[in-house]
Every structure is written in structure tokens, then in C-alpha cells.
Amino acid sequence: MPKITLKGVTVDFPFQPYKCQEEYMSKVLECLQEKVNGILESPTGTGKTLCLLCSTLAWREHLRDAVSARRIAERASGELFPDRTLASWGNAIPEGDVPACYTDIPKIIYASRTHSQLTQVISELRNTSYRPRVCVLGSREQLCIHPEVKKQESNHMQVHLCRRKVASRSCHFYNNVEEKSLEQELATPILDIEDLVRSGTKHKLCPYYLSRNLKQQADIIFMPYNYLLDAKSRRAHGIDLKGTVVIFDEAHNVEKMCEEAASFDLTPHDVASELDVIDRVLEERTKVAQQAELHPEFSADSARSGLNLEPEDLAKLKMILLRLEGAIDAVELPGDNSGVTKPGSYIFELFAEAQITFQTKGCILDSLDQLIQHLAGRAGLFTNTAGLQKLVDIIQIVFSVDSAEGDPGPMVGLASQSYKVHIHLDAGHRRTAQRSDVWNTTAARKPGKVLSYWCFSPGHSMRELVRQGVRTLILTSGTLAPMASFSLEMQIPFPVCLENPHVINQHQIWVGVIPKGPDGAQLSSAFDRRFSDECLSSLGKVLSNISRVVPHGLLVFFPSYPVMEKSLEFWRARDFTRKLEVRKPLFVEPRSKGGFSEVMEAFYARVAAPESSGAIFLAVCRGKASEGLDFADVNGRGVIVTGLPYPPRMDPRVLLKMQFLDEMKAQSGAGGQFLSGHDWYRQQASRAVNQAIGRVIRHRHDYGAVFLCDHRFAHADTRAQLPSWVRPHVKVYDSFGHVIRDVAQFFRVAQKTMPEPAPRAAAPSLGEGGGIVSVSVSPGPLPTRKAMSLDVHVPSLRQRHTGSPVTKDTEGSLCVEYEQEPVRAQRRPAGLLAALGHNEQLAEGPGDEALPVEEACGCPTLLGPREKRPAEEQRGRRRKVRLVGSSEVPAASTDTGRAKLFMVAVKQALSQASFDTFTQALRDYKSSDDLEALVARLSPLFAEDPKKHSLLQGFYQFVRPHHKQQFEEVCLQLTGQGCSSPHKHGHPQRQGAQLALDSSGRKESDPKLTVSQGATRQLDPCEQLNQGRPHLASGPFPAGDLNCSLHKGSRAPGAEKQHPSTVSAYLADVRRTLGAAGYSQLLTALTTYKQDDDFEKVVAVVAALTTEKPEDLPLLQRFGMFVRPHHKQRFRQMCVDLSGPGTQAPGPQEGGPAMPSDPVCEAPSPGPRKTQSKISSFLRCQACWRQHLQVSRKCPGCCAATRKQTLAQVFWPEPQ
């Protein structure tokens, strides 16, 4: 990596930096060396994150070297280097600034708005040569892995339940943190949030407290910036800012976050819910106290409940809340009910009436914390503690600064400077049911009032940060313009400022102001014109014409959701949208967060489709799509801004903000360091526009066009608010025709001169070229661990080779891409057990290669019955291996063909909306590997209609190998049938041309060997059937079976599994015998047992269901097939206890039908015959196996006629 020296510091950069990047890093180093604050703007795509990381970490390493130099000099005492001064070891650091020891080297705190942005930053860090000790802080909601805590619905309930478990040492994940947190695997690598959770799950330790441990020794700490700006969060996470370097990335949001973190709205609903909870706890505690008087032994139980509050304490809390409610209701509003505004200091008068003061706040907070922690984790009515938690937050905000000796003066003055109190009628909530106790106030019957305490100065939070002892504060973003006003708002000095140019050239960006549409109508988003038919019609025509000349993805930003929705409604009514979607389909940003990622993925997929002409994404300024998303290259070749997104002018908070700024400016005089209210109002719109413009150019080789569709952009003062890198390219057009001409010319030139963007990973599909099917032999036997893997032997479970031919069919390849993984380009044994399947690898002729649709898509009901294999194949007759061109191989004979046919079947069965949901679910599964989320999306599509059950079962072939068992169980619950029947496993039939291999991997030398001979010659029941592990027997082997008992210690993990047909038969019997209700209870208990491994719980349910009638007892015994190995012995004993001594406990067949003894087997077997008979259905001497397989072709257990292949493929199922 190139090394460059800036301000005396050597920076390791991944590549040769651009001039603007060197300038940016120089400014960062200037801030660090001079211990001053800085505001640095650098457009998106200029690599500011990489520059920040490399420059700060290089400076920190330089400082570490200086500490080493000081230690060497001190140790040498000037004898070794008498002529060398300390400064010569590090010329960028004055001698007085060198820390005394390594622990004094400043930590770096890197903050961004969201964890997803932090994940991108950590990914950038991995691309550098620096390997600092890293810590990322997150909430319990993101990091906690304790099942009980994760179930809590609200974050504050998770916090209190977690604290309670930690205090009582009842969380085993937390108990492991101290012991395991120093392990090299956890302390050394660079871990993000997802890595922490994975490592915590793997090592059984708490990721949340692990991150807090790592924080102590970390060189750089990543966190969302509300952890820094909110004093409550700083205290909760134990963040010490003294002497640290704090970096705010994406700092254009800091102003809003500072104000929101220090503000609150207290509604009547909040107060009512707080009173309800206190009422219920008070009633509960009163009953406990009465019981304790009558029965003293109850007092011990009360003491153990964990709540140290007496009923009198709870009554005081209730009185405080009622007085606060009364004080708020007593405030008189003007006749028009517009609300009343008071100075910020009024909040202390209001709270004092409720006896909430600096002196009492500590006791009140302690009582509320105890109450919430007491209720944490409790079910039913005691889960609604959000109101209590909000009251805690409110008291901490109001009394955020501790006054010396209880003197409220400083805090009152601060509140007067930065806050306003606003009280208005509650329009959003209605009062809950009227409380009818004697404490109710008459005010409860009046309309409720909302108490708002709003901070209007982001400088309030920033000054508090500086007071914590921060060494250097750096704010950076791609859109901070206008810079002067931004620094004024922060109200702290920023000596270092930078407004960087972009790294792109002039021919990569086109910016045009369009004041009029094609019909000559003025374009305006002003309040009085934005909903007029003339304006909406003209805007629709503009969008239609621009979509013709902008290739690929086009983004359209509206000022607000109502404007976007009204525009869409107008265009739909007049057929605009239908005409648009002929060229580019429309995707609309949803209001909710839930569906946003789905819409984005669908947009990306549509743009990336090979034959697609692109797509249009309609979004909102300041919305979810306006920042942090990747619209690079073809995803965003054009951005249309349809208006200036001013805040709502009549909103009380906006009016008060403007009024507050005007007051501050008037008080500071002519040269005051404050914005006017009007300037701030205009700046809010400009910042939102600049953020939207930043979506179009994302890197050095990107290009795109910006369309500003509002006549007000033609004004010079509005254009002056645009980013500095955009302003030189802006051109105002009088004629719309000239816009289309220039844009078309711009894209023609750009497409010729700019390099093609790197292609995204395409889904594998079927090619059209010729070629031959390669057949290669394995260089040697499979490793033991690999040979034990099921997907090595079963082709349908095998992950697909990345070099396979591709096609343009995106739907057909959608399922296949989930299974991709680089593997060796070799054909592997296709059978489940190599000992029984060697000769089955002989390839079929070309006539056998076409799979029926049913087999290709894994859906048995789609087409006709499966055709029979030729008789000569069944008899094991030799066949020739023919190599044919790939053009002769039907698509259905490949994984891609199966996927294509399956997708076609799904598309025919579902509506377009449902099919879109289905494809999106697959993409999410590919990226997240979350089977539960996939099932939640697929269940409503397929499970409700019995005709679609086969499609859900057919999806089994595309589920990743480690999820197949879980998906099998889900299918069983949803459809009543399993989905792993032999044809869906993709067994050896019709697998293409392969050569038969012997156990050493060489080509089979005896061409005349028949199927039966090959099987019987190599079969040894102890060594080769599942590597000698027990199958149906769950207990110890009989003493006489010495050959097999040698392997009893190496039981396969899935050896206790039953065949799906056995499970289906049992569940069908349960449904028939116990009815729907009993069946549902048993399934629920079984699912819970799988998750928590609680044997007592599941047995209690099953025993209650199956022991009411004597005839139901066999169901209890057969339930043993689901019992895990370490519970088998207890289950057998329980069956004996419940059934009586005369009833035999379920044996290895888990209560299934008894296997008939084999009259053929006369081989001597030491030990009692009774014990041997329990496993006689599976263990046979070689002679008996040979006779059964070669002559009778019957199952050795049930004597049913069958082919040898079926035996190999279904793991010897029990007879039905």
C-alpha cells in the first residue's frame, strides 16, 4: 500500500490518494495535532470514510511511537543517544504533547447515524492495513441472545429484565463473559454487530457485555451518535469522553438529533398509563400486606419478590403523577385552543407543583426504576410500562445537569436560553377509560393537554460534549452546506473548515433547472400551487419525457409523503402511470420501515435485469431513501427533485424554532453568531435537496444527471445553497426541448467515454452454447468428514459449481443462486451410501436425460406420474457412457432447469403481487440466511390453499442443506406431509453421465459386475452402513454384537431420525385419536421441546393427552421417535411407570409395528436372542443381506418387495 507523509505523519493508504483526499486527511491531522474542532465536507464518492480512518489511525500510531521514543530516551538516560533530542523521534508531535504512557493515548470514538452505516465503516476499516483493537456498541435489542429477554416487546423491558438477570447471576451468557472475553478469537479480529452476535452464540457468552468489556481496551469505538448526544445513553453505556477524539460521520443529522435527544412530549395517555400500572401494583402490594398480617409466612415470599417499595411509597408516586396532571390541566389556553408558550424555565415551576425538584428527583427515579425492574418479564397487564419509562426519561432530561448543593440557578438559566415550554390540546389521543377511585381529579373529565418541552439549540448538547473533556471534535458529511450557518448552530468554535470538491470531471455530471414543463406550465411545489391540476399534469409530462432519455435507474424525490401520494393519485386517474410503466416500472417508497427493504430489492433487481430498460423509484426528501442507500452506477443515472421541501410553516415547533432564532439573533446584536429564523427555514429545504442530489454520483467513475423541477431553483439565492461541487454545473433552461436535447447528448457521450460499471454477481442460468458434458474422476477417496455429509452424496442437496453455464432467465435461476459455492469441478458419487451405490453411477443414455416436470421442480402434482425406468436399468444391466453436447441436454436436467420449471409453476399458481413477495423472500433468504423469516413469508402464499401444498413441499430442493431438516418439520406442520420423499432428494436416477468408481476413486475395473454383485461384495453392516453407526437402536448394543459395538461411541448426530413416512403416520394417528385440539397441543409441545430441550415440559403434555384412555397408550410409546438421545432412558422408564410392569417400554423402533424376525438368518450370534431380536430388523450377517438383496429383493425387516436403491436412499424406514 502507498505510504504518504502529511504534516509529519506517515499514512498507509490503500491506493494512491487523489488531491482532494490528501487535503481532507491534512485537515483531519491538523485538528488532531492542534487539539481543535473541525467541520469537513467532502462529497459522497470521494472516500471520506477511508480518509478519516487512515489519517486518525496513522496519527494514533505516530503518537504511540512517540511514547516509545520517550521511554527509550528515559531508559537510556541520555547515555546511548546524548546528541539526539526526544523531538527527533517524532517531529510531528511537540515534546509537551507526548503522553506519559500508552494508556494515555487518546481513544477514537467514531459515531454515525445508524448501525448499518457503522457496518459499512467497519468494512472499510478491514480494507486498510491498520488493525486496531475495535469495539462496536449496540443496544440489547440488537445484541442480546438470551431467549427470555429477546421475547420482551419493548427495549426498556429488555433493559430491566437483563439487569435483573445479571444482578442475580441467572444469565449464563453473562456469566461466561469474564472468562471467555480474553480469548484471541474474540479480542483480536475486527467485529461488527453481526460478528459479535455470531461469536456470542458460538461461545455462549453475552455479546452486549462482551462489547462493553472490549470497550475498555479498544483503540477505536464505533457507536450510533445518539449514544453520545443523549446524556442518558452516555451514562447507561458508561462512555467516558475525557481526552477522546470524537468523529461524527454523516453529521448533517446532528442538529436534529441534538434537539430531539433533549426534548419530550408528555401526553395525557402517558400519564394515564403510568397511573394504571401504579394502581395495579398498589392493589397487588396491598393484598400481599393484608395476607402477611393474617399469615406471617407470606411475608417471606413478599420479601423475595424483589420490590422494596411499600404501599405508602407507591401511593406517593401516584400522588406526584396526579399533581403533575392537575398542574398541566390547570394551564389556561387561548380561546382558539392554539396552545400557550412559556419560557424554558417554566418547566421547573410546573414540576415543583408536583414535588419533582432537584432534591426529590433521585428518590423518584430510584422508585420508578425499581418498579419497572419488578415488572420486567411479567406477562399480562404488567407489560405496559412504557409510560413509566418515559417519565424516567423526562425527569432525566429536565434535571440533566446536577446543581451544586441543590442550587437550580445554572440549570434554570440554561433552560431559559435553549428551551421553550409549549402546552396545547391533545389531538392525537383520547383519554383511556375514566378511573373511578377517590383520588381522581375533576380535571380528568376535561380534554387532555400535552406538555411539550422543546430544545431549539443543538449547541446545548454540543457544549455539553465539550464540557466532558473531549480533545477534538470532527463533524463530517457529504452535505453540510451552507457551512457558515452549520457552524453557527453548533455554538462551539470550529477553527478548521473544509469544503472539498468532487473527484469527478465535468463530463460526468449534468445539472439543469427546469422552471416550466413541456406544456409551458410553471413547475412549483409552493403550498398554493403544488396540488393544482395544471402543475401535477405538467410534472407528469416532465417525468414521462425524462424517463425516455435517462437510461437504467431514475430517482424522483418529492417534498413530502402527502405530495407524492397526491401526485400518484392524479397520474393514475389520468393514465400517466400506465404510460410510464410501459418503459420503466414504478417503485414507491413506503411510509413504514417494514416494507422498505423489499421495495428496494425489487427496484435493484428490475434495474439489473438483462433485458430491462430500467425502473423509476419515487421517494421523499428526508425519507429512508434519501441517505445511506446505494444508487451507484445503473441504479441511479438520474435524480429528479420535484420541489423545495420546506418544513410545515404552521407547525408550532417550526414557528417556535424560527421565533427562538430571531430572539437569539436580536440579543446578540448586529454581529451576532446566530441565524435568523427565515435563514434557518430556507436552509432546512436546501439541506434536504443536497442530500437527494448526493444519491447520483457515488464514486470516481460514476456519472448521472440532476433535474431541479421547481421555478424557485432559478433564483440565485436558492442555487447558492447547493453544494460547491454542483454549483459550477447548474444551467437554467427556458425551453424544455433543450433539456431533453442536452441530456440525451450528455448520456451519449458518457456511455462512450466512461468505463462500464463492474457487473454485479449474476444468478447462474442455462447457457445456449455448445460443448460437451465433462466427466471427471475423483483423484481419491472423499475425506471421512466430507463423506459423512449428506449433500456430498445426494445431488439435489449438493451446492452448485460456480462455473456452470448461465442463462438470462432471472426467475429460473433465482432459487439456484442460493446454493452457489466454489467447489471442485468433479462429479461425485451420487448415492446415499457409496457401498450400495457404486454401479448406480453408470450414466444413462440420451433418452434418459430428460426429466419430467414433476421431478424437475419437485412438485408431484404438477404433471403426470413419474415414468418408469427402463427394465434393463432395474436389472443392473451394463450401459454405455455417451458424451453429448450441452445443447442436447434439456434444461430440466440441470439445477437451473429445475429451478426454472419450479418458478414457472409458482408464477402460474400465484397472483403477480404474491409472486413478487415470493421472489423477494428468496432474495432476503439469500442475503440473511434466515429460514424463519422465509417461512413466515411463504406460509400465507402456499399453506392456506391445499392445492398449493405441493409447491411448498417442492421448495425443499432449494433450501440450504443446514436448513433442510427444519424446513421438513415446517412442511409437516403446515401441510400434514413431509417434503423429503425420494424423488425430491434428487437420488441417483437420471443424474447424467458418470463413471463407476471403486472405493479408491479409480475407474471400476470389472465391467461385467452387476448391481447386486457390486453391492453384496462391498457391503458390511457394521463398517459401511452409515459408517458403522447405529440407526434404529437407541440403547446400547447387545453384548454379542462385538463388531458393531466397537463403533457405538461415534453415533451420528442424526442417527435417531425417523423416516418422514413414519412421522406422518404417527401424526395422522394422533389427529384421528385425539382430535384437532389434542393434535395442536402435541405439535406445539413438540416444537417447544425442539427449541428449549425441556423434557419434563413436553412429557407432561404428551402424557396428559395419551393416558386418559388405555387404548391411547401406544401413542405415548410411539412418541419415543421424537425424544432426543439423552432423554431416551428417562422416557422408557416413564412409559413403564405409566403403562404398568406388564407393558414393554418402546424399543428401538420407538413404538412402531414389530418387525418380524428373519427366518433365513441362522448365523451364530452370542448373547441372549431376545436382545438381538430388537435390532434384527437392521443388523444382518453379510450372507443374509446378499440373499435378500440379490434374490428376493425384499426388505429384510418387513419383507416388502422393493428395489435395492430404495433401501439405500431412505435409511431403512420402518414398515407402515
Swiss-Prot record:
Protein name in the entry: Regulator of telomere elongation helicase 1
Protein role: A probable ATP-dependent DNA helicase implicated in telomere-length regulation, DNA repair and the maintenance of genomic stability. Acts as an anti-recombinase to counteract toxic recombination and limit crossover during meiosis. Regulates meiotic recombination and crossover homeostasis by physically dissociating strand invasion events and thereby promotes noncrossover repair by meiotic synthesis dependent strand annealing (SDSA) as well as disassembly of D loop recombination intermediates.
A Pfam family hit: ARCH_RTEL1
Entry's family note: Belongs to the helicase family. RAD3/XPD subfamily.
Residues that coordinate or bind [4Fe-4S] cluster: 144, 162, 171, 206
Species annotation: Bos taurus (Bovine)
Chain's gene name: RTEL1
Domain of life: Eukaryota
Ranges in coiled-coil conformation: none
PROSITE patterns registered for this protein in UniProt: HELICASE_ATP_BIND_2
GO cellular component: nucleus
